[in-house]
From Swiss-Prot:
Belongs to the bacterial ribosomal protein bL20 family. This is Large ribosomal subunit protein bL20. The gene is rplT. GO terms for cellular component: ribonucleoprotein complex; ribosome. GO terms for biological process: ribosomal large subunit assembly; translation.
């Protein structure tokens, strides 16, 4: 059996870790042990925050909608109830965007939701 020297593969592995740790502070960018731990932790944070981002944006859309329907004497929950009763199936992201960029269209939706609540 021939001897296998690991220099090339080890260097390639280290290079991959250092590339991922570029921009990190202190030893975390240039010692392999610290860089490997930092890159792994960064991956954990990235995984966690990809999940968290969905919650954060949904909460933002809800806050925007609540603020947008208040001038029409509605709360967010009553507005959503009115939408479901009137059969309008537009998601919160689109509704939030309409409230900001297309106030006239949003107002028409609010009027329909209000009518469904009154009926």
């Amino acid at each position: 059996m021939s001897r296998v020297k690991r220099g090339v593969t080890a260097h390639a592995k280290h290079k991959k870790v250092y590339k991922a740790a570029k921009g990190f502070y202190g030893r975390r960018k240039n010692t392999i042990r610290a860089a490997k731990a930092a890159v792994e932790k960064a991956g954990q944070y990235a995984f966690r925050d990809r999940k968290r981002k969905k919650r954060t944006f949904r909460a933002l859309w809800i806050q925007r909608l609540n603020a947008a329907v208040r001038p029409f004497e509605l709360t967010y929950s009553r507005f959503i109830d009115g939408l479901s009763k009137s059969g309008i199936t537009v998601d919160r992201k689109v509704l939030s965007d309409l409230a900001i960029n297309e106030p006239a269209a949003f107002e028409a939706i609010v009027v329909k939701a209000k009518a469904a609540l009154a009926a």
